[in-house]
Amino acid sequence: MIILKDGYKEFADCMYYFLHYYIGYGRYTYSATNGSCDKGEYLDKRHNQCCNRCPPGEFAKVRCNGNDNTKCERCPPHTYTTIPIILMDVINVENAQPDHLIR
């Protein structure tokens, strides 16, 4: 177990998402073990496969289908996501609650 000092958890999470989504980790889906998946993934119950969640600032352009993983795309200008997500939509900044925005 690695213990991180205050403020380094965000860095570790950022590196995890970078490796997981951009270097090629998680490129393919895999069968869920005991109905659970790794951090940054979700269980697609239709196929019993572990699939990538899109990182904050991106949305699912194409959901995983049992063979190919989720295809994420950056949110368009003036929209956002704040959490790893599997939705195929983003939130318009004009409709956002003020406490949801990062300035």
Swiss-Prot record:
Which cysteines form disulfides? C37-C50, C51-C64, C54-C72
Q: Does the keyword Glycosyltransferase apply?
A: no
At the top level, the lineage of the source is Viruses
PROSITE patterns in the record: TNFR_NGFR_1, TNFR_NGFR_2
**Key word rRNA-binding present:** no
Membrane-spanning ranges: none
Which keywords fit this entry according to its UniProt record? Disulfide bond, Late protein, Repeat
Q: Which residues form the signal peptide?
A: none
TNFR-Cys repeats: which residues? 36-73, 74-103
What is the similarity comment for this entry?
Belongs to the poxviridae A53R protein family.
Please, what other remarks does the record include?
A: The A53R protein from Western Reserve and Copenhagen strains are predicted to be inactive because of mutations that introduce stop codons or frameshifts when compared to other poxiviruses.
This chain belongs to which protein, by name? Truncated secreted TNF-receptor-like protein A53R
Organism this protein belongs to: Vaccinia virus (strain Western Reserve) (VACV)
